[in-house]
Amino acid sequence: MKTVQEAPLARYVREYSALPGLQQADRVEYILCRHEDMLCFSARRKTAAAPVSFYTAGLEDAPACRMLCYLYENSIAPEQLRDVLADLCGWTL
């Protein structure tokens, strides 16, 4: 079992400003890490206790990094992460 956490393959942070009557200030962090032969996509709100994660295998690092960028650029909510990636990847483990 690994005890040293490897650096993420990619990381993006989306900041949301407070807009009275519309939304509260928030921050969502998107991270892609490799865990042995699996890739782990995760997204976490600043206010959430734990990130939402999606593990997949059989995907190269470069396309996975582009998928993480897609999640960030399209402001995919952490609550939607698994559904969006399941559609893009076709399966999960």
Identify the function of each model-found stretch.
Residues 7-10, 40-41, 62, 78:
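General helical secondary-structure elements
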Residues 11, 21-24, 34, 61, ...:
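Generic detector of low-complexity/intrinsically disordered segments
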Residues 31-57:
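A short, structured beta-strand/loop element
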Residues 12-15, 35, 46, 83:
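Positively charged, low-complexity intrinsically disordered regions
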Residues 2-3, 50-93:
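Mixed-charge, Lys/Arg-enriched low-complexity segments
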Residues 1-29:
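Negatively charged, low-complexity tracts enriched in Asp/Glu with abundant Ser/Thr
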